[in-house]
Amino acid sequence: MSRTGYTLPVFAAAAARAALLHLIEKVPCASVQLDLLGEQAAIPIEQVARLDAETALGVTRSDPGDNLDLTRHTPVWAWVHLEVGTGEVLRLEAGEGLGRTAAGEAAIYRYARQLMEANVAPLVPTGRTATVRFILPEGRALALRTSNAAFGILEGLALLGTSGLSQPLSAADHLESFRAALRERAERERRLVFCIGAGGLQAAGRLGLDQGATVQTGNWIGALLVEAGMLGIESVLLLGYQGKLVKLAAGIFNTSSHVADGRLETIAAGAVAAGADIETVRTVLEAPTADAACALLAAAGWAEKIYAALAERVSGRSVEYVRKYTERTMAVATMLLDRQGRVIARDRAAAEWLAEP
């Protein structure tokens, strides 16, 4: 059975709460209880240290459970300093290893701030302000293995996420739970929206799509497309991050990077088919991430044409895949998103899907 862990903002909030409790109560702290805005969690604390009368440091370590997450076991520090009130209860800062946006702001996003308001702000003594500086000693090095820089997070990791739970969506024993959810939806719906990742699910909400027709897929897009075909589903809209979905254009229907990649090669092939010059194709192949490739193509004026064609090919290959394994024809439409969940391309079938009542 796969083990659920927690996202990075949870450990940041836990370290901050532990440091502030130690500063106020002057007692050791082996764990802290956190309100995850819906449920409670006990988070182990590795160390707390009082640095002076007004300053303490809390240290914990990231544990994403069985999810494939590069932050596993990375240390998370929170430096907390109390001072005479300045009109705000909490001041959050980025220390070493926590990224900043291109505008220089700390990469601390909404859910992380909500956790801090719920779990740290109530502990701040009346008339005081707590400055919390998050430090990720390995963050700068780990960020080099992500696509953070491609969407504006520089010099470190981000406290990013919409939930405290880190679900192991790529673990093999979760496929059956996805299939069960699909079967449940198929009992009442003939058209389904396959949401690839949390970004796909959030985009479905923003686009006003029927939440009762959404199905999360993890990396098993091919298996679930076939299941949908066997269940007699009429059509499926694929909605997700382009770096995942373009793999389907190359016939890769398990999108885990541990199974196969080929993203840049597929995008480069799309550039060739669109008539891009050889230098543009070369820059795609040399791009560090799929996001970077997309940005390069946008700057060169090629992105719209290339990704629209890739979306068409994703749908076409998906229809062929379902027909091959079920001998049935199921319509498929595709919308490609960037890392922020914005639509960068859709095929004609997706445009028709959105136009229907």
Swiss-Prot record:
SUPFAM superfamilies: CbiD-like (SSF111342). It catalyses: Co-precorrin-5B + S-adenosyl-L-methionine = Co-precorrin-6A + S-adenosyl-L-homocysteine. Pathway: Cofactor biosynthesis; adenosylcobalamin biosynthesis; cob(II)yrinate a,c-diamide from sirohydrochlorin (anaerobic route): step 6/10. Its EC number is 2.1.1.195. InterPro entries: CbiD (IPR002748), CbiD_sf (IPR036074). HAMAP family: CbiD (MF_00787). Belongs to the CbiD family. This is Cobalt-precorrin-5B C(1)-methyltransferase. It comes from Gloeobacter violaceus (strain ATCC 29082 / PCC 7421).
